[in-house]
């Protein structure tokens, strides 16, 4: 199944969190926080203004992005857990 977000929405795959700290302590699954970093899978066509013009999004597929801890809605596409969020929930592009 292919999924295409509408308007200014973005589909993001979370990047897996580190298994251990910089000091070498292994973090159990129950103590891990969900990462606020991910890879853009798909983007919508853009934000629609009141006059009908469409402004394209700044992010594109395969961009590595940072987003707020509580951003987006979790969805399952082809058995994979992904996030769908508005572009404004994205804090920035890495690299």
UniProtKB/Swiss-Prot annotation:
One Pfam family per UniProt: Cpn10
Q: Per UniProt, what is one GO molecular function of this protein? A: protein folding chaperone
Q: Where is it mostly found?
A: cytoplasm
Q: Which domain of life is it from?
A: Bacteria
Q: Which GO terms describe its biological process?
A: chaperone cofactor-dependent protein refolding
One GO cellular component this record assigns the protein to is: cytoplasm
Q: How does it assemble?
A: Heptamer of 7 subunits arranged in a ring. Interacts with the chaperonin GroEL.
Q: What family is this protein classified in?
A: Belongs to the GroES chaperonin family.
Q: What is this protein called?
A: Co-chaperonin GroES
Q: Which organism is it from?
A: Novosphingobium aromaticivorans (strain ATCC 700278 / DSM 12444 / CCUG 56034 / CIP 105152 / NBRC 16084 / F199)
């Amino acid at each position: 199944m292919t999924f295409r977000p509408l308007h200014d929405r973005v589909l993001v795959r979370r990047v897996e969190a580190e298994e251990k700290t910089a000091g070498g302590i292994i973090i159990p699954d129950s103590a891990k926080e969900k990462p606020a970093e991910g890879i853009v899978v798909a983007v919508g066509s853009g934000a629609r203004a009141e006059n009908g013009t469409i402004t394209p999004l700044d992010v594109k597929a395969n961009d590595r992005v940072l987003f707020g801890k509580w951003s987006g809605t979790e969805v399952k596409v082809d058995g994979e857990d992904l996030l769908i969020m508005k572009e404004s929930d994205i804090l920035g592009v890495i690299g």
